[in-house]
Amino acid sequence: MSQYQNQYGAQTRKTDEYGNPMNQVDQYGNPISGGGGLTGEAGRQHYGTTGGATDHGHGQQHRGVDQTTGYGTHTGGVGGYGTKPEYGSTNTGSGYGTGTGYGGSGTTEYVREEHHGDKKGVMDKIKEKIPGTEQSRTHTDGTGYGSTGYGASGGGIGNTGQEYVREELTVHPGDKKHGSAGQEYVKEERRGIGNTGQEYVREEHRVDHGEKKGIMDKIKEKLPGTGGCTGH
């Protein structure tokens, strides 16, 4: 049988240790086609997914990646996919400043009131009820003081105000006798202090007589029918 095979030109091919046919290449690495063997696309075995370079050799088996001639996984690309996001934010700062000055103008209040006959003593009210009596002089000054106001006459200062009242009464009887007793001086002071202020009332009654007679005695002398009139 072997003679018939040799007669028809059956050629043997060189194989490696694994039984794969060995290809001869030239000095540039290009395969040299043999006299026999598989030719064309039918004799080509491709290993790999995609190849970039095409091989027009015959009877070749290509194993490996990125072969110059053959089909392999020669994947690459100019364009790569990467994520490098750059995020820049421009912050706009806003400042809030509230500088508000509050200035108040101070006010000084000065109030002076003069009331004539508002605060009368008990004896003055009695004399008004009796006809024929005469009050020579009655003077009443009522001055109100606030927390920031001061009157001319001075005095004390309360929390919300102070009222200072002074009453003077001078009675001259008709006879005007001057004895050893001289002058009778009566002074009454009433003070009322509360949360809303202070009230100061001063009443003075001056009576000139010779025998230290009381005010009621002088009033009785002026009344008709009492027998106290001397006719002087």
From Swiss-Prot:
<protein>
    <recommendedName>
        <fullName>Dehydrin DHN2</fullName>
    </recommendedName>
</protein>
<feature type="region of interest" description="Disordered">
    <location>
        <begin position="173"/>
        <end position="232"/>
    </location>
</feature>
<dbReference type="InterPro" id="IPR000167">
    <property type="entry name" value="Dehydrin"/>
</dbReference>
<dbReference type="GO" id="GO:0009631">
    <property type="term" value="P:cold acclimation"/>
</dbReference>
<dbReference type="GO" id="GO:0009737">
    <property type="term" value="P:response to abscisic acid"/>
</dbReference>
<feature type="region of interest" description="Disordered">
    <location>
        <begin position="1"/>
        <end position="92"/>
    </location>
</feature>
<comment type="similarity">
    <text>Belongs to the plant dehydrin family.</text>
</comment>
<feature type="compositionally biased region" description="Basic and acidic residues">
    <location>
        <begin position="131"/>
        <end position="140"/>
    </location>
</feature>
<dbReference type="Pfam" id="PF00257">
    <property type="entry name" value="Dehydrin"/>
</dbReference>
<keyword id="KW-0346">Stress response</keyword>
<feature type="compositionally biased region" description="Basic and acidic residues">
    <location>
        <begin position="200"/>
        <end position="223"/>
    </location>
</feature>
<feature type="compositionally biased region" description="Gly residues">
    <location>
        <begin position="73"/>
        <end position="82"/>
    </location>
</feature>
<feature type="compositionally biased region" description="Polar residues">
    <location>
        <begin position="1"/>
        <end position="12"/>
    </location>
</feature>
<dbReference type="InterPro" id="IPR030513">
    <property type="entry name" value="Dehydrin_CS"/>
</dbReference>
<dbReference type="GO" id="GO:0009414">
    <property type="term" value="P:response to water deprivation"/>
</dbReference>
<feature type="compositionally biased region" description="Gly residues">
    <location>
        <begin position="143"/>
        <end position="156"/>
    </location>
</feature>
<dbReference type="GO" id="GO:0005829">
    <property type="term" value="C:cytosol"/>
</dbReference>
<feature type="region of interest" description="Disordered">
    <location>
        <begin position="131"/>
        <end position="156"/>
    </location>
</feature>
